[in-house]
Every structure is written in structure tokens, then in C-alpha cells.
Amino acid sequence: MKIFGTDGVRGKAGVKLTPMFVMRLGVAAGLYFKKHSKTNKILIGKDTRKSGYMVENALVSALTSIGYNVIQIGPMPTPAIAFLTEDMRCDAGIMISASHNPFEDNGIKFFNSYGYKLKEEEERAIEEIFHDERLLHSSYKVGESIGSAKRIDDVIGRYIVHLKHSFPKHLNLQSLRIVLDTANGAAYKVAPVVFSELGADVLVINDEPNGCNINEQCGALHPNQLSQEVKKYRADLGFAFDGDADRLVVVDNLGNIVHGDKLLGVLGVYQKSKNALSSQAIVATSMSNLALKEYLKSQDLELKHCAIGDKFVSECMRLNKANFGGEQSGHIIFSDYAKTGDGLVCALQVSALVLESKQVSSVALNPFELYPQNLVNLNVQKKPPLESLKGYSALLKELDQLEIRHLIRYSGTENKLRILLEAKDEKLLESKMQELKEFFEGHLC
């Protein structure tokens, strides 16, 4: 049975993520990390979901039962776990979060001792241990060999200092009015502190988590409220994070949501202007707009494509010796400061860009026009191989003949089919998307 999806393990708390399942997974992961253990410490953080307590306690029980010492740091962004795992010399880090999913879901993400997400072969190794009944039951410790657990509440300060170091030392935010939407999630404490300490005039919304309101009509997936607040407050910028703050959506001074590909383009060129790029390559996923590639080429930069998912962006960056890349969804990686997407690092870089451009954000963050794209997330009841659907190949052939770029795939974390179309003719795009929706609704819904 395959346990891992495209971003760790994710599912409905109490259904897939039961205490027994989580404990078994915790033992399996712990035994895997034991093979290369240096400090016998594992760090655990979480977002603000109510089920986080259940999952955390199950993991702590599992890891201490095989001799690991566990450090619990409470609600913190996913990128903070990646940073602190390496900074605190832990064998591994674990983030309990389902990211942008509703509060009923939860998930578990693993990081190695260097703060990187696990590769697929490492996940498969954990799955093999998970299914090895004899190994699991022979691994429990007794007496003094059982591990300990302790909670540390002040590590947020380390992460705040780290974030501030990512911001240019010759700048401050005193001239900027900024609205932050923390999605009632993991950034609700740290984001306001960072921006306030750097001098910004800050308004914070959706910063009162109650365990059940994470991502609820707010944050990166629902930035309309942020857009309204930016206009009402006459702010220079608005930043919306998702539940675990590894994703960022930016709103300009006019209340417009800045497209993720425009953000990648303008930030890449900004990094080049500071001689901060380690190579001429910038990494983006196959969902990126063709206009991004053309814009970067005009700036003597090369776009490298990779599979969808920020861990694949990170791997592709390492392969191409690049230190900047991301997804149009808002997972943007500055690897000099973060091993995974970090919404706060990205927000600080956007702020610096706007300051140094000496332009309003609606101008500074609008470097090129995009080709029309249409993205639909279709709820599905089953996930058969797309190639097995009668008429599917003919549909793709027709799209190719019409010069409509297409990317159709199942979500790795939800029961959804993602359909992306891109073409120069917007009306043609809309009509073909309607055809595709009807086709897939007939086969999958």
C-alpha cells in the first residue's frame, strides 16, 4: 500500500490519520532515520488544526518508544521546521500539517537532517518498514533506553532572526503599509512580529486560530478579503499565507492579485540585478505560463521546467545549481535562505523589490502580460489512468492541432482532477475547457 502522496502523508484526521496509523508511521520513519542518526533528536512542529494534538502525541509516543528524544515546538510554519531541523542539529524534522486543505484534514511532512524534504526513494524505504510487522514489533525499547520528549516554546526567536537576515540590511519597511492574512494558521505569531520589527505599518487579519478555522475563506486560497482590506487600508502591499505558510499570494496597492508567474519573473530579475543568482537558470513547474519563459529569455535568463510540487522544484534547483525557483501557486524557494517554499522569506523579498524599484507595487510587480490560461479543479469520485478513458487520446490530439497547451493530472493530495489549458485565443480556450469538463464529468464523477 502506498502511503506517501506528492507532499508527505495527508488525509482526513480520524479516518486515514488515526492514532494507530500515525504511531506505526512514526515508528517506521524513526527506524529509517536511526540508520543515519548523529544526535538521536527529532524535531516536531505543527500548524493550528485541532487534530494536531492527536497526531503530535501519537508521533511522540512512537518515536520515544524506539529510543528517540523528541523536541516539540508547537505551531510554526513548515519552512521554520526545515530551518530549525538543521539549525538545532536534529536527525530529522516533522511538520504536522495539511497545508491549504480544510481543517478536517491533516498531514505529516518529513525533513532530513539538512532540512530537505525526503526523496521518493526515501519515502519508499519508510513504506517498506511500515509494512514489516516483525521489524516494527522488535524495535521497542525498555527501561532507560526509552526516549524523552520536551517542549521548547522560545525557538520562534531563532526563526525570526533568520527571516530578518534574509532582508537586505540597508533597507527597512518604515515607508510601507502592509496587510497580512495569516489564514488562522502557522504564521499567525511570527509574521506580524517580523514585519513590525522591520518597521512596517502592519494590519493583520485572520490571526485568531481556534483549531477549526484554518484556511476557512481566508489566506492564500481565498485572497479576496485581503484584496478588500488592502484597498480599504490604502496599503502598499498585501500578503496572504496558507495554513503552514510555505505558500504566498501577493496583492498589489490596487487590490489586484499578482499572478504567481509574474512574481517568479520579477523576483528572478531582481535577484539577478543584485548578483544574487548562483546560475542563469530559474526553475518552475510545467504549469508555468509560456510568457514567463519568454520574459526570462529577454533578460538573459533560462527557465528550467520540473514536475509539479515544491520538493521537485527544490531537486531541480540542486541539479541545475540554481538558488531560485518556484510554482505559480505561490511556493517560491530562495535556497540561500530556505530549503523549501517559505512564504515569509518571499514576502520580505517582494517588499525589498518594491522599495528598491521606487514604484508602486501595481507597476513594480507587473513586468509582462500572460498568455490566457484556464485552470479548473474538478472533484472526482475515482482516479483511473487517464489514458484508459475512451476518447481521451483523441481529445489531446485535437488540443495539439489547435495549438492549445494542456496539462491534465490528478491531485496528489485530494480527490481532484486538475485541468490547465493555455492558448492565445481566450474564447477558444473557454469552449475547449467546457468540452473537457463535460468529458471528465461523464467518466470520473
Swiss-Prot record:
<dbReference type="InterPro" id="IPR005841">
    <property type="entry name" value="Alpha-D-phosphohexomutase_SF"/>
</dbReference>
<dbReference type="InterPro" id="IPR005845">
    <property type="entry name" value="A-D-PHexomutase_a/b/a-II"/>
</dbReference>
<dbReference type="Pfam" id="PF00408">
    <property type="entry name" value="PGM_PMM_IV"/>
</dbReference>
<keyword id="KW-0597">Phosphoprotein</keyword>
<keyword id="KW-0460">Magnesium</keyword>
<dbReference type="InterPro" id="IPR050060">
    <property type="entry name" value="Phosphoglucosamine_mutase"/>
</dbReference>
<dbReference type="GO" id="GO:0004615">
    <property type="term" value="F:phosphomannomutase activity"/>
</dbReference>
<dbReference type="Pfam" id="PF02879">
    <property type="entry name" value="PGM_PMM_II"/>
</dbReference>
<dbReference type="GO" id="GO:0008966">
    <property type="term" value="F:phosphoglucosamine mutase activity"/>
</dbReference>
<dbReference type="GO" id="GO:0005829">
    <property type="term" value="C:cytosol"/>
</dbReference>
<dbReference type="GO" id="GO:0000287">
    <property type="term" value="F:magnesium ion binding"/>
</dbReference>
<comment type="similarity">
    <text>Belongs to the phosphohexose mutase family.</text>
</comment>
<feature type="binding site">
    <location>
        <position position="246"/>
    </location>
    <ligand>
        <name>Mg(2+)</name>
    </ligand>
</feature>
<dbReference type="GO" id="GO:0006048">
    <property type="term" value="P:UDP-N-acetylglucosamine biosynthetic process"/>
</dbReference>
<protein>
    <recommendedName>
        <fullName>Phosphoglucosamine mutase</fullName>
        <ecNumber>5.4.2.10</ecNumber>
    </recommendedName>
</protein>
<feature type="active site" description="Phosphoserine intermediate">
    <location>
        <position position="99"/>
    </location>
</feature>
<dbReference type="InterPro" id="IPR005846">
    <property type="entry name" value="A-D-PHexomutase_a/b/a-III"/>
</dbReference>
<dbReference type="GO" id="GO:0005975">
    <property type="term" value="P:carbohydrate metabolic process"/>
</dbReference>
<dbReference type="InterPro" id="IPR005844">
    <property type="entry name" value="A-D-PHexomutase_a/b/a-I"/>
</dbReference>
<dbReference type="InterPro" id="IPR036900">
    <property type="entry name" value="A-D-PHexomutase_C_sf"/>
</dbReference>
<dbReference type="GO" id="GO:0009252">
    <property type="term" value="P:peptidoglycan biosynthetic process"/>
</dbReference>
<feature type="binding site">
    <location>
        <position position="244"/>
    </location>
    <ligand>
        <name>Mg(2+)</name>
    </ligand>
</feature>
<comment type="function">
    <text>Catalyzes the conversion of glucosamine-6-phosphate to glucosamine-1-phosphate.</text>
</comment>
<dbReference type="InterPro" id="IPR016066">
    <property type="entry name" value="A-D-PHexomutase_CS"/>
</dbReference>
<keyword id="KW-0479">Metal-binding</keyword>
<dbReference type="Pfam" id="PF02878">
    <property type="entry name" value="PGM_PMM_I"/>
</dbReference>
<dbReference type="InterPro" id="IPR016055">
    <property type="entry name" value="A-D-PHexomutase_a/b/a-I/II/III"/>
</dbReference>
<feature type="binding site" description="via phosphate group">
    <location>
        <position position="99"/>
    </location>
    <ligand>
        <name>Mg(2+)</name>
    </ligand>
</feature>
<dbReference type="Pfam" id="PF02880">
    <property type="entry name" value="PGM_PMM_III"/>
</dbReference>
<feature type="binding site">
    <location>
        <position position="242"/>
    </location>
    <ligand>
        <name>Mg(2+)</name>
    </ligand>
</feature>
<dbReference type="InterPro" id="IPR005843">
    <property type="entry name" value="A-D-PHexomutase_C"/>
</dbReference>
<keyword id="KW-0413">Isomerase</keyword>
<dbReference type="InterPro" id="IPR006352">
    <property type="entry name" value="GlmM_bact"/>
</dbReference>
<feature type="modified residue" description="Phosphoserine">
    <location>
        <position position="99"/>
    </location>
</feature>
